[in-house]
Amino acid sequence: MPLRLEIKRKFAQRSERVKSVDLHPTEPWILSSLYSGSVCIWDYQSQTMVKSFEVSELPVRSAKFISRKQWVVAGADDMFIRVYNYNTMDKVKVFEAHTDYIRCVAVHPTLPYVLSSSDDMLIKLWDWDKGWMCTQIFEGHSHYVMQVTFNPKDTNTFASASLDRTTKIWSLGSPDPNFTLDGHQKGVNCVDYFTGGDRPYLITGSDDSTAKVWDYQTKSCVQTLEGHTHNISAVCFHPELPIIITGSEDGTVRIWHSTTYRLENTLNYGLERVWAVGYMKGSRRMVIGYDEGTIMIKMGREVPVASMDTSGKIIWAKHNEIQTVNIKTVGAGFEVTDGERLPLAVKELGSCDLYPQSLKHNPNGRFVVVCGDGEFIIYTALAWRNRSFGSALEFVWSSEGEYAIRESTSRIKIFSKSFQEKKTIRPTFSAERIFGGILLAMCSSDFICFYDWADCRLIRRIDVNVKNLYWADSGDLVAIASDTSFYILKYNRDVVASYLESGKPVDEEGVEDAFELLHEVNERVRTGIWVGDCFIYNNSSWRLNYCVGGEVTTMYHLDRPMYLLGYLANQSRVYLIDKEFNVMGYTLLLSLIEYKTLVMRGDIERANDILPSIPKAQYNNVAHFLESRGMLEEALEIATDADYRFDLAVQLGKLEVAKAIAMEAQSESKWKQLGELAMSTGKLDMAEECLVQAKDLSGLLLLYSSLGDAEGIEKLASQAKEHGKNNVAFLCLFMLGKLEDCIQLLIDSNRIPEAALMARSYLPSKVSEIVAIWRNDLSKVNPKAAESLADPSEYPNLFEDWQVALTVEKNVASRRVHYPPADEYLNHAEKSDMTLVEAFKRMQVIEDEETEDALDENGEPDEEVLEENKVEESTDEAVEVDADEPEETVLVNGKEGEEQWVLTEHE
């Protein structure tokens, strides 16, 4: 059966002919050497070029990373080897290495060595710790040496491929080859070693269009791979998967099974001839160099093949080797930190006859099934003995220990606990996946059908695209994961049982009330498990979350991809594994889960009984959960964080509680927030106290001015000046009618022009004094401008109604400190737009007219007219402008002002 490897193209870049490729071990970089003479570094994540080196005008046939030195080493047709620092772009070394084209360079994995091979039929060893001295020359080939590669299992030996049709094995320190592998009909272009520990193999590719697998211990050809129609230019054993990759000048890349040597897949990206293949240990990425560019593919999933039983025993598969660890072996003396790799002792359990692609314990942990290559094998978990096997595309366990296999899209078989076949189901649709658990589920591309295990009766069809399915241990809840979200459903088993017992027919949709949708969460689930009624999962952003009652809580932000293994209740820890088989644990309290579950069920009394068992450090977590359920009062009682308790108290309108928290915290922001809330609720005394504590002078100005509190405004003016809040201080002084202090504040703030203009409008008698100050200050910067300033006392003709303004100032000076009560505002509002100077002049005109009317024909006073005037005077109101109303606009000497005055008739 085929491996069914998922192959995805991750990077594609057109360029000149690519002669070699390499992957960086830590950075997301691809190194390509081009026939045009340059070397490029591409970032396959951002799909951009990171670096480019112009090496030579002739082809660069080989380039490799030396990551431990931050170098790139390249060999070209100009016979020189060049070394560059890929961080600084500096050229580290240039030296002539051969007398003909350099075909290949290979870097020793640990020692400071580089091998080079050439058309001069020589292989040379270079030591960069000795200034790139040539420390050894290997002679023996009779034609071009096309490639050299170190043996990863014995780095003291290496292999070379030559157009003399041979492959030779060499040892460092010996000038002669250990032995020669001869079997190809034409020249050998490429060679690579098998990286696994179980087979001493290497592979070669030749111009005879074949690739040969060799056992270098017996020196025999194990297998010949035929299928390409042109020269094979690149070969490799994949370091992680049981496959062989061959690339040819026929434009195809062929993927072969490394055990059965069956052709699994053929790739053709239409970029003409294949020249190079690159890989990296620990990664499933492969990079391919073509005539017209570079392609990177990713094969299979990087999810580790591992399973944990309920006691903490973990079994995993590394290639065909099966290993086991036990979490309980971590001693009590070891302090376990969340996210820290556990120091687990790995034991070899055995090997597997097929390449494992999935591995899963049965519910009681006694058996383990391994699936792969279209087959399954059931082993005992302790002794790793084979109990059953067969062909299957998929295998699932039931909650009772039975199992089902999917042989094809149209046939599913069910087996008993004793491994005996019970039933065969032929679904009426194409079953692309099956899932186990309480019910047997089969899904197509856009729906899923649930069946009971006993009689295979349809329970329910649900129209949803399913990627995975997770049953709770209780069997009452199930999570259905799709591409973008997951759904929590309740399984009503009693409803189903009563319906089936009634004998009513089941239609193609199943039992209508079998499932009840409880929650939908818009997050993609990568892996998930149930703990009681709590669903734990990691999402597409690799955050470890849990969901109780539809409320999602993030436990931890994972720094790399990790996959859930299980939960141990006695340790209150959830365990995960990464692709390197490192196991980490994270704390998740069972009492916390139980508490949230009871709250969701409305059983508050039992939830409160559990609360004392939850550590105080988790109380804020509990409070946030209660807040999300709308239980703010309970959240406030439980929360321990001062900031959070303050926010809850504000939400509840409990100002006294919030005030007590603010007193402890002494936070200006809290006092300000509380002051605004107190003001909005009419608690003005508390608002004043809060604003004072917050030093919110603007807020106090609003409060005092609204209350008409002259004493408070006076104190605020002093505070504002002390704190340098001149705008607030000015407004306070202005509202108090302290014009001299306002002008002095402007002068002290170096706002002398504004002081002069204000004096012109409100205190004409002070203008001359301020102009002198202004002139003196301005003369330091612009003497001519200073001389042009006019003093009203010297040039009264330039200032309209100057004498009238001085007279008005004298008349109203005594009234500036009197504040009419607020309830008399309407009596003054109509006169708020009156200009004092104009009013004064008009009153003078009226007096003159009245004097003329009071004289008779002989110029003597007319007693009758005088008597009428007295009556009118007694009934007319005085022309008043309220000096304490800053909200209205008053025109003074034709200027806008904010002060209001009370005018009396001129006697």
Swiss-Prot record:
Oligomeric complex that consists of at least the alpha, beta, beta', gamma, delta, epsilon and zeta subunits. WD repeats lie at residues 13-52, 55-94, 97-136, 140-180, 183-224, 227-266, 269-309, 351-389, 461-501. Residues 850-887 are annotated as: Disordered. This is Coatomer subunit beta'-1. Pfam families: B-prop_COPA_B_2nd, TPR_COPA_B, WD40. Signal peptide: none annotated. The coatomer is a cytosolic protein complex that binds to dilysine motifs and reversibly associates with Golgi non-clathrin-coated vesicles, which further mediate biosynthetic protein transport from the ER, via the Golgi up to the trans Golgi network. Coatomer complex is required for budding from Golgi membranes, and is essential for the retrograde Golgi-to-ER transport of dilysine-tagged proteins. InterPro entries: Beta-prop_COPA/B_2nd (IPR006692), Coatomer_complex_subunit (IPR050844), COPB2 (IPR016453), G-protein_beta_WD-40_rep (IPR020472), TPR_COPA_B (IPR056176), WD40/YVTN_repeat-like_dom_sf (IPR015943), WD40_repeat_dom_sf (IPR036322), WD40_rpt (IPR001680). It comes from Oryza sativa subsp. japonica. The keyword Protein transport applies. SUPFAM superfamilies: NHL repeat, WD40 repeat-like. Gene3D superfamilies: 1.25.40.470, YVTN repeat-like/Quinoprotein amine dehydrogenase.
